[in-house]
Amino acid sequence: MLSCIFKDTIFLSSFLAVSLICMTTALWGTILLVERRPLLSESLSHACYPGLLIGALLSYKVPLFSDSLWIIILCGCAASILGCLCIAFLEKKLAMHKDSALCLILVSFFGVGVILVSYVKDSCPLLYNKINAYLYGQAATLGYAEARLALIIFCLSAFVLWWWYRQISVAIFDREFAYSCGLRTRTAEMIVLVFISLVIVSGVRSVGILLISAMFVAPPLSARQLSDKLSSILILSSIFGGICGALGCYFSVAFTCQSIIEGKATVIVLPTGPLVVFFAGVLVFLCLIFSWKTGWITRYIRRKLFLFSRDEEHLLKIFWYLQEQNIYRVSMWDFVRSRKLQEYFGSKAFSGFRMFWLCKKGLVSCFDHQXFLTDKGEAKAAKLVRAHRLWESYLVSELDFNKSKVHNFAEEMEHVLTDELDTTLSKMLQNPDYDPHKREIPKLKGK
C-alpha cells in the first residue's frame, strides 16, 4: 500500500510540499519560542488573511496577474508585516499590553478578511471555492510548483539562520549586549519577520490559517524538552516538523475509507491539516512525558530516588543521635522509641529493607539483632549532622533568624549541601564549634 501511495504524483507533490512547509515553520517557530513570542505566529497568520484574499482577487480579475501565485504571496506577506508593525505600534506608542495588542490585530485583520470573503462569495463564486482552502488547508491541491516554492523557502531559511545565527542568537538572549557590540539587531528582526510572514503565507494552503500557528509552536516545544542548546533545538524542531507533516499527509490518504450513509456509498477523507496538527500534539505529549531531561517520568523517578536517599540519610542521622545518647549498638526497640524516628518517618512502619540496604552499602553492620555504624557510615552521618548545624548557625548569625525556627530549613538544606558550600560556610562563620542550640558541630576528618 505504501508503494502504491508514493507512486501517485498528486500525493507525492503535496507530501513534499507539506513536509517542507512544516520543517520551515518549525525552524522559525523555534526563534519565536525562544523569544517568548509564540503567539505572534497566531496573530500574523490571521493578519495575512485579507492580504491573501486581495492577492487572489487580483490574480482572478487583473489579466496582468492571471493565476499568479507570487501576487498572492506578496499581498499576504505585506498584510502579515503590516499586522506586525501595528502590533509594535500598539505596544510601544500606545502602551498597550502585548497580549491585548496581539488579540486586537488578530480579530481586526481577520474581520476585514471575512468582509472580503462575503464580497467574493457574491461576485466571484468560482474564486470563493478556491479561497476556502486558506482557512482549513487543502493539501491535495498543492502541486509541484508549490513543492518547489516550499523547498526554496526552506533552503533560504536554513541558509539565513546559519549565516545570521550569531546575530540572531545574541539579539534573542541579550539585546543590550547586541546593541553595545554594534550588531544590526534591527536588520535581524526584519529578516525574521519577513521569513515568518513568507512561511505563513506559503503554508496556509497546507494546514490552514486557523491551524498553522500550531506548527510554529508544537515542534519547537517538543525539541525544547530534549535539548537546551539553540542549534540542537533548531535541528530537532525541523526534523519533528517534517515528521509530523509526512505522517499527516500519509495517514490522510491511507485511512481514506468508504461508508454507507442512508443507502449511499460515501467516501470519508481525513483532512491533512488537522492530522498534521494532531501528530504534532501527540509528539509534544510524548516529549513532555518521556523526555530524558525534563520528562514527567524522568522527574518522577528522580524525585523517588531523592526521597529514598533522603530516608537513608535520615536513618544514618538517627544512629548518630543515638550515639550522642551513648547508645552505640542499636536494637529494634531503641529505634522504635527514638524521637527522631517519629519526626522523620511519622507513623509509617519501620522498613527492614532500608536497614538491609544500609548494610549492603557498608554503612551499617548488624550483629546479634543489633546494628551499629561502620566507619564509612559514621563519616557520612557526621557530614550530614555537620551540614545541618552549620546551616542553622548561618541562618541565626548571618540572617538574624530566630533559632527556634531554623530547624526545618536546615533539614531541607543538609541533603543538598556541597563540600564547597560547607567550606565557604565554615570560613564565613570562623569554624564554629557549636550551633545556636549549643550542640557540638562534628569536625570532618582531615580538617
UniProtKB/Swiss-Prot annotation:
What are the record's GO terms for cellular component? ATP-binding cassette (ABC) transporter complex
- Location in the cell: Cell inner membrane
> How does the protein associate with the membrane?
Multi-pass membrane protein
What Gene Ontology terms describe what this protein does at the molecular function level?
Answer: DNA-binding transcription factor activity; protein dimerization activity; transition metal ion binding
Q: Which residues cross the membrane?
A: 14-34, 38-58, 69-89, 100-120, 152-172, 192-212, 233-253, 270-290
GO terms under biological process: response to zinc ion; transmembrane transport
What this protein is reported to do is described as: Part of an ATP-driven transport system TC_0338/TC_0339/TC_0341/TC_0342 for a metal.
Alphabetical UniProt keywords: Cell inner membrane, Cell membrane, Membrane, Transmembrane, Transmembrane helix, Transport
Instruction: Write down the species.
Output: Chlamydia muridarum (strain MoPn / Nigg)
- Which InterPro entries does the record match to this protein? ABC_BtuC-like (IPR037294), ABC_TroCD (IPR001626), Fe_dep_repressor (IPR001367), Fe_dep_repressor_sf (IPR036421), Iron_dep_repressor (IPR022689), WH-like_DNA-bd_sf (IPR036388)
Q: Which family does it belong to?
A: Belongs to the ABC-3 integral membrane protein family.
Q: Which Gene3D superfamilies match?
A: ABC transporter involved in vitamin B12 uptake, BtuC, Winged helix-like DNA-binding domain superfamily/Winged helix DNA-binding domain
From the Swiss-Prot or TrEMBL record, give the protein name. Probable metal transport system membrane protein TC_0341
Q: Which domain of life is it from?
A: Bacteria
